[in-house]
Amino acid sequence: MKVLGIDPGTATTGYGLIRSEAGRVKAITYGTIVTPAQLEMPLRLYQIYRELQALLMEYKPDAVAVEEIFYNRNSKTVITVAQSRGVILMTAAAAGIPVAEYTPLQVKQAVVGYGAAEKKQVQLMVQKILGLQQLPRPDDAADALAVAICHLHSYRLSSFLESSATKAGEKR
């Protein structure tokens, strides 16, 4: 299974593509989509759309996992991140790829096992889980890889629970 994790933003959107095969998880690619601050918002959003669409066409992930917006006192930041999330969700939907959304708390719990983990702890666990030689950089890409790992854990758990429920139903 291939999962594309996304850490949304207007200035910088992180992405991280992972693959799970035979119980092993590997990073395929990761990086950022950076939009110039001098561009008007519609053009920045269009750039995110174009670059994400190219990633989806090239790598054909089985799922896209997007981090939800966390509370921020700056309402302008929340609005611009929400706009980029809308573009991301629409781009994945248009490509026919299932989308899952996770809170930062869920991501930290899935990757580190502790919902109040520090950013550095998350990065170290992402490095360890994916067997990377160095910490994934930049931070937005590391966060996106963590979101993808979170989805993979969630998918495995739900598949296991479905399988267990089916087997329990067959025994009746």
Swiss-Prot record:
The active site is at residues 7, 67, 140. Mg(2+) 1 binds at residues 7, 140. Binds 2 Mg(2+) ion per subunit. It catalyses: Endonucleolytic cleavage at a junction such as a reciprocal single-stranded crossover between two homologous DNA duplexes (Holliday junction). Keywords: Cytoplasm, DNA damage, DNA recombination, DNA repair, DNA-binding, Endonuclease, Hydrolase, Magnesium, Metal-binding, Nuclease. The keyword Cytoplasm applies. Gene3D superfamilies: Ribonuclease H-like superfamily/Ribonuclease H (3.30.420.10). It holds the Pfam family RuvC. Coiled coil: none annotated. One of its GO terms (biological process) is DNA recombination. GO terms for molecular function: crossover junction DNA endonuclease activity; DNA binding; magnesium ion binding. GO terms for cellular component: cytoplasm; Holliday junction resolvase complex. Belongs to the RuvC family. Homodimer which binds Holliday junction (HJ) DNA. The HJ becomes 2-fold symmetrical on binding to RuvC with unstacked arms; it has a different conformation from HJ DNA in complex with RuvA. In the full resolvosome a probable DNA-RuvA(4)-RuvB(12)-RuvC(2) complex forms which resolves the HJ. This is Crossover junction endodeoxyribonuclease RuvC. It comes from Syntrophomonas wolfei subsp. wolfei (strain DSM 2245B / Goettingen). The lineage of its organism: Bacteria, Bacillati, Bacillota, Clostridia, Eubacteriales.
